[in-house]
Amino acid sequence: MNLLDPFMKMTDEQEKGLSGAPSPTMSEDSAGSPCPSGSGSDTENTRPQENTFPKGEPDLKKESEEDKFPVCIREAVSQVLKGYDWTLVPMPVRVNGSSKNKPHVKRPMNAFMVWAQAARRKLADQYPHLHNAELSKTLGKLWRLLNESEKRPFVEEAERLRVQHKKDHPDYKYQPRRRKSVKNGQAEAEEATEQTHISPNAIFKALQADSPHSSSGMSEVHSPGEHSGQSQGPPTPPTTPKTDVQPGKADLKREGRPLPEGGRQPPIDFRDVDIGELSSDVISNIETFDVNEFDQYLPPNGHPGVPATHGQVTYTGSYGISSTAATPAGAGHVWMSKQQAPPPPPQQPPQAPPAPQAPPQPQAAPPQQPAAPPQQPQAHTLTTLSSEPGQSQRTHIKTEQLSPSHYSEQQQHSPQQIAYSPFNLPHYSPSYPPITRSQYDYTDHQNSSSYYSHAAGQGTGLYSTFTYMNPAQRPMYTPIADTSGVPSIPQTHSPQHWEQPVYTQLTRP
């Protein structure tokens, strides 16, 4: 019985807070019940002067433990039981509008249900302000605290009901009602269709969340308002994720898609995405990217499991911030088609462009200086390419994927790189290929052997394609010099004059 004391005191205080009930030490079940207080543990231990039975009579106490509930609950409940026709409970209730002709037969109540229903009636009459859910919780807690002797009357009542139920419905078999599955099926179908089309906003927000600025602000991305029609079920509550969470997993949670095995995020298929829709979001939010720290989220070899020839698609998918920012929709495919069959005019020897350039010593210049004169990166690009003519085309693909950290530099240096960069497909992320710091600065990121080890067998490919890069062809891949975001008029100047245009479009402050 003493088990109950702390709980009774707790419910007391609750009750004082809720109703200011006049009887402070009686539990909510009996306070206000008209019965004389039986020798329940609470009143017994705290207010002995109110008890009808003296505290020192163990026989009476034992008898009351078996027959009475603490704090007069038993008496209150028995009053309810007397006045309540329990045979009504299991009787068939006709289901309106149901296709079945058979009425639904409820299960017989178990002991807890008997207790809860009776006590709820009593308490609801006494404390109409009590919230039903709170009442249920309290009744459940009290039931768990009762000992066997206290539960016995309810167990017996439940047994009686069960026997009665069996007489009334001899062939009764419990069949839980099936939930109507129509809505669930529709919802699943909708989710399936939603997952096939990924809205550009969702992609951009997923990318933005990888930026270090929003690592603590990732909760903004998952906040319910920002789920752009993709979350299944209730939106994820905003949480501040652990810093060591894998970015792939975070993206997937944010985009509401199930995580495949291994936790790796599959590359987004951009055929379904209108790249033009991205640009406004990207331009307005481009300041939030911390260019230099962005590399830490990258796998060492670009996207695992993606063939290198898909570099353009993958690149715009995962880091398409800069390249898609200023492009009209579909530009990427135009560039790809041009590149796939490059006309091979061999007028110029392979080494011709690098000849007048500066020596490659500035290669070790820190990449954090986006304001370096554009002529330098041009020199780096050329010397890198010409001094390693035996290396493969893949080299530069991988380099591009390895460091998408050049968002700010790209706008300033892209013209020079464009002149010599279109070696193969992946460089045509729309409107200008972003080969920037990672090419002339590859020594900062990894030793160069890792770049060239995976593509040793294709030396001639680089060498031959390099011949196509004569000045006559350069205008085909002109950078964006105007601010409209459309590829501008071909510029036939020599590379030295390409520094003039001022690229104010997306540079960070």
UniProtKB/Swiss-Prot annotation:
It is found in: Nucleus. It comes from Callithrix jacchus (White-tufted-ear marmoset). Residues 56-67, 160-174 have a biased composition (Basic and acidic residues). A motif (9aaTAD 1) lies at residues 275-284. The transactivation domains TAM and TAC (for transactivation domain in the middle and at the C-terminus, respectively) are required to contact transcriptional coactivators and basal transcriptional machinery components and thereby induce gene transactivation. Residues 1-67, 160-273, 334-415, 479-509 are annotated as: Disordered. There is a cross-link at K398 (Glycyl lysine isopeptide (Lys-Gly) (interchain with G-Cter in ubiquitin)). Residues 63-103 are annotated as: Dimerization (DIM). Residues 105-173 bind DNA. Residues 63-103 are annotated as: PQA. Residues 42-52, 380-415, 485-509 have a biased composition (Polar residues). Acetylated; acetylation impairs nuclear localization and ability to transactivate expression of target genes. Deacetylated by SIRT1. A motif (9aaTAD 2) lies at residues 290-298. The modification Phosphoserine is found at S64, S211. Residues 341-376 have a biased composition (Pro residues). This is Transcription factor SOX-9. Transcription factor that plays a key role in chondrocytes differentiation and skeletal development. Specifically binds the 5'-ACAAAG-3' DNA motif present in enhancers and super-enhancers and promotes expression of genes important for chondrogenesis, including cartilage matrix protein-coding genes COL2A1, COL4A2, COL9A1, COL11A2 and ACAN, SOX5 and SOX6. Also binds to some promoter regions. Plays a central role in successive steps of chondrocyte differentiation. PROSITE patterns: HMG_BOX_2. Residues 30-41 have a biased composition (Low complexity). Keywords: Acetylation, Activator, Differentiation, DNA-binding, Isopeptide bond, Nucleus, Phosphoprotein, Transcription, Transcription regulation, Ubl conjugation. GO terms for molecular function: chromatin binding; cis-regulatory region sequence-specific DNA binding; DNA binding; DNA-binding transcription activator activity, RNA polymerase II-specific; DNA-binding transcription factor activity, RNA polymerase II-specific; RNA polymerase II cis-regulatory region sequence-specific DNA binding; sequence-specific DNA binding.
